[in-house]
């Protein structure tokens, strides 16, 4: 499982270094093979171990293709998916088109989301995190089922 937010640097060639604390798990789960695609809701990228992405693909494949919204989601997620592999230094190359989509510049946030990571522009991530915290702290903003989750 992937947890935590990590500030990492995008180098001049468009590569990011995976923090060492995640490398062993990625190696054991998918031999360092990853899939990156757009997030269809937020202006970020989703980075999956290959084994996890294959589960997503199976669900997408099973969607009824006569529904336009299903085809749209398939086009967005599968059409933008790119195979990646960690190199010997634990780095991976983010394709230019995907970097542009997420507005990734020098400073990037790698955010663990249990079964995947999100890649955010650092400023966008910080603004979203601040907005999320402010929204959840408003009286009555949290549904009862979520309130029970908070320790």
Swiss-Prot record:
Record-annotated SpoVT-AbrB domain positions: 5-52, 81-124
Location in the cell: Cytoplasm, Nucleoid
Entry-linked CDD domains: MraZ_C, MraZ_N
Gene Ontology biological process terms in this record: negative regulation of DNA-templated transcription initiation
Swiss-Prot/TrEMBL keywords: Cytoplasm, DNA-binding, Repeat, Transcription, Transcription regulation
SUPFAM superfamilies, alphabetized: AbrB/MazE/MraZ-like
Keyword Repeat attributed: yes
GO cellular component, one term: nucleoid
Description of how the protein assembles with itself and partners: Forms oligomers.
Name of the protein in its database record: Transcriptional regulator MraZ
Protein species of origin: Pseudomonas savastanoi pv. phaseolicola (strain 1448A / Race 6) (Pseudomonas syringae pv. phaseolicola (strain 1448A / Race 6))
High-level lineage: Bacteria, Pseudomonadati, Pseudomonadota, Gammaproteobacteria, Pseudomonadales
């Amino acid at each position: 499982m992937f947890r935590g937010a990590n500030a990492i640097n995008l180098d001049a060639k468009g590569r990011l270094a995976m923090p060492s604390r995640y490398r062993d798990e990625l190696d054991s789960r998918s031999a360092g093979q990853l899939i990156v695609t757009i997030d269809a809701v937020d202006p970020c990228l989703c980075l999956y171990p290959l084994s996890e992405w294959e589960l997503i693909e199976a669900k997408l494949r099973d969607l009824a293709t006569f529904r336009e919204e299903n085809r749209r989601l398939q086009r967005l997620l599968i059409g933008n998916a790119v195979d990646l592999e960690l190199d010997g230094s634990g780095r991976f190359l983010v394709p230019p088109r995907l970097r542009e989509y997420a507005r990734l510049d020098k400073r990037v946030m790698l955010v663990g989301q249990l079964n995947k990571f999100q890649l955010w522009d650092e400023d966008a991530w910080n603004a979203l995190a601040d907005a999320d915290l402010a929204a959840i702290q408003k009286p009555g903003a949290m549904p009862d089922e979520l309130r029970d989750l908070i320790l």
